Protein backbone atom coordinates (compact mmCIF):
# COMPACT_ATOMS: atom_id res chain seq x y z
CA UNK A 1 0.00 0.00 0.00
CA UNK A 2 2.74 2.50 0.94
CA UNK A 3 4.67 1.61 -2.25
CA UNK A 4 1.57 2.40 -4.30
CA UNK A 5 1.04 5.69 -2.43
CA UNK A 6 4.71 6.65 -2.91
CA UNK A 7 4.47 5.94 -6.67
CA UNK A 8 1.30 7.99 -6.91
CA UNK A 9 2.93 10.97 -5.14
CA UNK A 10 5.93 10.81 -7.49
CA UNK A 11 3.57 10.83 -10.46
CA UNK A 12 1.69 13.88 -9.10
CA UNK A 13 4.94 15.79 -8.49
CA UNK A 14 6.21 15.00 -11.99
CA UNK A 15 2.97 16.08 -13.66
CA UNK A 16 2.88 19.28 -11.60
CA UNK A 17 6.43 20.16 -12.65
CA UNK A 18 5.52 19.53 -16.32
CA UNK A 19 2.52 21.88 -16.14
CA UNK A 20 4.56 24.61 -14.46
CA UNK A 21 7.15 24.34 -17.23
CA UNK A 22 4.56 24.64 -20.01
CA UNK A 23 2.66 27.39 -18.21
CA UNK A 24 5.80 29.45 -17.86
CA UNK A 25 6.84 28.74 -21.43
CA UNK A 26 3.54 29.57 -23.15
CA UNK A 27 1.77 32.05 -20.87
CA UNK A 28 4.77 34.36 -20.78
CA UNK A 29 5.51 33.93 -24.48
CA UNK A 30 8.94 32.50 -23.68
CA UNK A 31 9.89 35.71 -21.91
CA UNK A 32 11.40 35.80 -18.49
CA UNK A 33 9.04 36.49 -15.61
CA UNK A 34 8.85 40.19 -14.80
CA UNK A 35 8.47 41.23 -11.18
CA UNK A 36 5.70 43.71 -10.42
CA UNK A 37 7.05 46.89 -8.92
CA UNK A 38 5.36 48.50 -5.96
CA UNK A 39 3.94 51.96 -6.64
CA UNK A 40 6.27 54.71 -5.53
CA UNK A 41 5.38 57.14 -2.77
CA UNK A 42 4.92 60.77 -3.68
CA UNK A 43 8.00 62.83 -2.88
CA UNK A 44 8.38 64.41 0.55
CA UNK A 45 8.71 67.91 -0.85
CA UNK A 46 5.89 70.07 -2.21
CA UNK A 47 6.82 69.69 -5.88
CA UNK A 48 4.01 67.21 -6.65
CA UNK A 49 1.43 69.61 -5.19
CA UNK A 50 2.98 72.61 -6.92
CA UNK A 51 2.95 70.80 -10.29
CA UNK A 52 -0.76 69.98 -9.93
CA UNK A 53 -1.53 73.50 -8.70
CA UNK A 54 0.28 75.03 -11.68
CA UNK A 55 -1.61 72.79 -14.17
CA UNK A 56 -5.03 73.43 -12.63
CA UNK A 57 -7.27 75.74 -14.68
CA UNK A 58 -9.82 77.71 -12.71
CA UNK A 59 -11.74 80.82 -13.75
CA UNK A 60 -12.94 81.36 -10.16
CA UNK A 61 -11.09 80.63 -6.92
CA UNK A 62 -8.75 77.63 -6.74
CA UNK A 63 -8.99 76.10 -3.28
CA UNK A 64 -5.47 75.50 -1.97
CA UNK A 65 -6.38 72.45 0.12
CA UNK A 66 -8.31 70.48 -2.50
CA UNK A 67 -7.51 72.19 -5.82
CA UNK A 68 -11.27 72.55 -6.35
CA UNK A 69 -12.49 75.44 -8.49
CA UNK A 70 -15.22 77.43 -6.75
CA UNK A 71 -16.80 80.88 -7.03
CA UNK A 72 -15.65 82.20 -3.65
CA UNK A 73 -13.19 80.92 -1.00
CA UNK A 74 -15.81 79.90 1.57
CA UNK A 75 -17.28 77.47 -0.99
CA UNK A 76 -14.11 75.33 -0.84
CA UNK A 77 -14.93 71.76 0.18
CA UNK A 78 -13.20 69.98 3.02
CA UNK A 79 -10.46 67.63 1.87
CA UNK A 80 -11.88 64.75 3.94
CA UNK A 81 -15.66 65.31 4.24
CA UNK A 82 -16.21 61.93 5.88
CA UNK A 83 -14.05 63.04 8.82
CA UNK A 84 -14.39 66.82 8.68
CA UNK A 85 -17.23 69.28 9.04
CA UNK A 86 -17.13 72.61 7.23
CA UNK A 87 -17.87 75.67 9.31
CA UNK A 88 -18.30 79.10 7.73
CA UNK A 89 -17.00 82.00 9.79
CA UNK A 90 -18.63 85.43 9.94
CA UNK A 91 -15.74 87.05 8.03
CA UNK A 92 -16.48 85.03 4.88
CA UNK A 93 -13.86 82.37 5.48
CA UNK A 94 -14.52 78.73 6.18
CA UNK A 95 -12.65 76.12 8.20
CA UNK A 96 -12.79 72.35 8.21
CA UNK A 97 -12.76 70.78 11.64
CA UNK A 98 -12.61 67.17 12.71
CA UNK A 99 -15.99 65.63 13.44
CA UNK A 100 -14.28 63.67 16.19
CA UNK A 101 -17.29 61.45 16.84
CA UNK A 102 -19.61 64.38 17.53
CA UNK A 103 -23.16 64.39 16.24
CA UNK A 104 -23.91 66.59 13.20
CA UNK A 105 -23.48 70.29 13.97
CA UNK A 106 -21.74 69.67 17.30
CA UNK A 107 -18.27 70.56 16.02
CA UNK A 108 -19.57 73.88 14.70
CA UNK A 109 -21.21 74.59 18.06
CA UNK A 110 -17.89 74.00 19.82
CA UNK A 111 -16.12 76.40 17.43
CA UNK A 112 -18.73 79.05 18.19
CA UNK A 113 -18.31 78.53 21.95
CA UNK A 114 -14.53 78.76 21.59
CA UNK A 115 -14.84 81.93 19.51
CA UNK A 116 -16.87 83.49 22.33
CA UNK A 117 -14.27 82.35 24.87
CA UNK A 118 -16.66 80.02 26.66
CA UNK A 119 -14.52 76.91 26.30
UniProtKB/Swiss-Prot annotation:
This is Long chronological lifespan protein 2. The lineage of its organism: Eukaryota, Fungi, Dikarya, Ascomycota, Pezizomycotina. Keywords: Signal. It comes from Sclerotinia sclerotiorum (strain ATCC 18683 / 1980 / Ss-1) (White mold). The gene is lcl2. Probable component of the endoplasmic reticulum-associated degradation (ERAD) pathway. Residues 1-17 form the signal peptide. Belongs to the LCL2 family. CDD domains: LCL2-like. It comes from the Eukaryota.
